[in-house]
Amino acid sequence: MTEQSEHSNGGVCASSIQPARNGGLCGHGGVGGVGEAEGDPVHTQIIQEDNPFVEHGQSYVAPHSGGGRTSSGSSSSASLQEGLLAPPLAKSSAGEQGRVRILEASKVSEGQGRSYITYTISYRDRVVRRRYSEFESLRKILIKLFPMTLIPPIPEKQSLTSYGKSIAGSNANYVLPSEAAGCDLAVSVINGSVNLNDQKMIRHRIRMLTSFLNRLLQNEEVTKTSIIGDFLDPNNANWNDVITTSATISSLPKSVLQCNPLDPTNTTPAHASLPIPPLSSAPQLMGKDGVGTSTKPSAEDMEFSRIEYEYKKYEQLLHTGVYKYNRRITRTMHELKQDLADLSEAFAEFAVEQSKGGDLAELLSYLSNANDEAAAVLDDLVGKIYYNINEPLSEAVHIAGAARELIQYRRLKFAQRDMLKKSLLGKEGHLKRLQEQEDDAKAIDQLVDQHLGEGTRINLQRPSEASPNTYKRKLFSRFNKLANIVKETVTYQEQDPKVNIKTVQEDIEQIKESLDVSASDLDVITATIRDVQLPAFSRNRDKELYDILKNYSKYMKEYAAKNLEIWKDLRKQEENA
């Protein structure tokens, strides 16, 4: 059984579903509504001034006021009268707003031998259960609603076979430790030893999903809507019902490349007709003649190619470099800890054997205790590095991947624009050929009319030298040719060139409209990702890496001091013996 086999409509909660009015997700008026007393949710009619997409869009339209994008705000304001958007949340600190905690991961059976894993989420005084497929659905919706915003990642899909067995066959409590705890292996996610890969996978999933929700709660753009509040609301037990009853979400295009980036809930026909390039599209689409649709990449395009390369290199260095080798070091220290513990037992047994010797047995006992204490100190270090260093590094790798998704989104929009340029060039070439054919036909008609206008005399006299048989053969030959011409004309009659020209001209106008929309979208997306999203990501990335390295230095320093103290005590004991 895999995560793909999960049904998205299997949320677990005893509370009844309160469908949102107007087909929207304004169940509790944002995240703040989750902490309110239980009862019928108050559905607020959304007015246009509270629409975060309009506010979000206007902040990016201003730099491009000279382009054709300036009308997006007005067009969207006319179409958005309802939806999932809730009034903006009041400004509050992270402590006031609270943090999400996943209390446990449990296996739930739905009959006929089918089962799935649910995660019990605690937020303020509310508890709700969600399954992995619902987290996945939430992220996909957020990517469409906020195509220019970095949406945090969720853990990758895994097989549920061993995953479910590890949960069902264990009495462990799968919770994250408090921030004040030592965060070692014993109290990390499972209250007990963490030696099984299945249990490590559970720890990894819970941490990633917890971080996913908390990062969303810290995102001002996302929290202006009610979608996170609805996801954490126990009244919305069935997340699939919430999605299907929302007219706003149901109206979103299947592909984010066909969404209006300034207002995805207001997708115009021009956006809906945009082509979808393949994921492997190169920045320059080549024609049949080997010539790109644009003569030369712009400086902006070259800059984004460089940024994409740097982010890919950063992700690679982090994953195959720092994270990889730090895991290896952690594993080595874990093995060393076990060796020290075994050595302590060996010295203890040796001390028992030498108990008659007096001084030697005492020294061996001191040495056994020193190795045992060293093993305990090293075990504490391993736990802190595993939880506070390795797992945050793993999360940083996934976050870097989410940042590259934004860059890839911009690259695909660039490829989309080039596809339209290539299509426009092809249609214009076709129109030119049709017009040339029309001109040639007109020239021939003029020559024929001119020739007929000169007047000709028809000789009805029978040729004297021609024999009757020869004349008959010529007559039948001309008749057969005429019959063939009529047959071909009836069977393979071509469309009127004027109709073809009109059709191609209409296609060109439609492509030009789509090209204008695509080019305008690309300008907005480029400015937003380059000037807002990526700099913010870089600042957060640097701060998180700084905290990781600071903790690493702190843990190693504390370990070195404790370890040195152990062996200093051993030397004093030997000197006093």
From Swiss-Prot:
One of its GO terms (cellular component) is phagophore assembly site. A 1,2-diacyl-sn-glycero-3-phospho-(1D-myo-inositol-3-phosphate) binds at R131, S133, K157, R205. InterPro entries: AH/BAR_dom_sf, PX_dom, PX_dom_sf, PX_Snx41/Atg20, Sorting_Nexin_Autophagy. One of its GO terms (molecular function) is phosphatidylinositol-3-phosphate binding. The keyword Oxidoreductase does not apply. Disulfide bonds: none annotated. It comes from the Eukaryota. Keywords: Autophagy, Endosome, Lipid-binding, Membrane, Protein transport, Transport. The keyword Protein transport applies. Residues 57-81 are annotated as: Disordered. It is found in: Endosome membrane; Preautophagosomal structure membrane. Transmembrane segments: none annotated. Pfam families: PX (PF00787). PROSITE patterns: PX. Residues 95-239 form the PX domain. It is a peripheral membrane protein. One of its GO terms (biological process) is autophagy of mitochondrion. Required for cytoplasm to vacuole transport (Cvt), pexophagy and mitophagy. Also involved in endoplasmic reticulum-specific autophagic process and is essential for the survival of cells subjected to severe ER stress. Functions in protein retrieval from the endocytic pathway. Belongs to the sorting nexin family. The PX domain binds phosphatidylinositol 3-phosphate which is necessary for peripheral membrane localization of ATG20 to the perivacuolar punctate structures. This is Autophagy-related protein 20. The gene is ATG20.
